[in-house]
């Protein structure tokens, strides 16, 4: 269990009775690839420009399934989710059918990238299907082809001193072809400013990216991002709630890399704090789809491999012209 997960897990179980949180099934001999998506009951509630539409609980291999830290929408109505144990989940949109998802490693040899398999972020070119994966510990970006075969890996110098355990938590290919990587850790303890790197094009090809400072709402940390048109991105935010029992708060903010303030800092604009409007969990993946009936956001949660948490997938209607939270 990596340090960040251990800290979160410890906080979450401290108020629970002993014996209620460990996964009990023994590990299977081989990884179980099939993943089931089961609808859950939801209430149609709105926060800012977002309205919860549907939700599903995902379940699979009793020991290895979980830990999702990133989500992207692939061409052809499919999704790709990545885990911080270096595995992937491919699945069809559950609102278009009930086919099971397929869970497995990014490479057939699970020892690949053993020293730093902590995948925390994904980005995709919707035209070609090429995917980029951001890895903590290594502070690197790996490019995968449309068949999801890993290829070139780069170690950007501007990310070299990012925290090994709170590094490239967000990576997004902006609508204009640029890439934005955001460090999870703030520059100062309990601060709101985060280092980021802006690539003019494919990060594997761009050897001279630009350093950026992003100011996010206080108390929240960035955990994923998705394109929102031109130089804008929606950033998924998480905050640990130290109540009894402890849990997580989820919010979404918007950043525009082309609109820095007078100090050169890109200030995020809060769009929504969800509170109890969505099922409460540790949401770490965010993707967007443009559909015939409008725009939708998709959130996936990280269960931290704890039996009292779930892997949830939520679908939210996004109406960009609706007023954001002031």
Show where each model-derived region lies.
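Sequence/structural signature of beta-propeller domains
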Residues: 2-326
């Amino acid at each position: 269990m990596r340090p960040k997960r251990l800290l979160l897990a410890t906080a979450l179980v401290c108020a629970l009775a002993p014996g209620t949180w460990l996964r009990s099934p023994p590990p299977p001999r081989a990884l179980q690839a099939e993943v089931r998506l089961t609808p859950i009951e939801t209430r149609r509630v709105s926060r800012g420009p977002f309205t919860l539409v549907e939700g599903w609980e995902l379940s699979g291999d009793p020991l290895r399934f979980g830990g999702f830290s990133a989500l992207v929408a692939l061409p052809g109505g499919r999704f790709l989710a990545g885990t911080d144990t270096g595995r992937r989940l491919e699945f069809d949109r559950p609102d278009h059918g009930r086919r099971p998802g397929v869970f497995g490693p990014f490479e057939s040899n699970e020892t690949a990238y053993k020293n730093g398999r902590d995948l925390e972020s994904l980005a995709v070119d919707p035209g070609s299907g090429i995917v980029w994966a951001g890895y903590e510990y290594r502070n690197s970006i790996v490019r995968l082809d449309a068949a999801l075969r890993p290829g070139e890996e780069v170690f950007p110098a501007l990310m070299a001193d990012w925290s090994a355990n709170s590094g490239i938590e967000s990576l997004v290919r902006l609508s204009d072809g640029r890439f934005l990587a955001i460090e999870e850790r703030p520059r100062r303890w309990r601060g709101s400013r985060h280092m980021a790197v802006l690539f003019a094009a494919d990060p594997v090809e761009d050897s001279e990216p630009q350093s950026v400072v992003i100011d996010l709402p206080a108390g929240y940390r960035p955990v994923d991002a998705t394109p929102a048109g031109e130089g804008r991105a929606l950033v998924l935010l998480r905050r640990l709630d130290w109540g009894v029992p402890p849990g997580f708060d989820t919010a979404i903010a918007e950043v525009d890399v082309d609109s820095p303030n007078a100090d050169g800092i890109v200030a995020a604009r809060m769009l929504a704090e969800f509170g109890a409007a969505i099922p409460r969990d540790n949401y770490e993946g965010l993707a967007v789809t443009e559909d015939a009936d409008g725009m939708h956001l998709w959130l996936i949660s990280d269960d931290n491999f704890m039996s009292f948490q779930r892997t949830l997938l939520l679908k939210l209607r996004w109406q960009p012209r609706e007023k954001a939270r002031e």
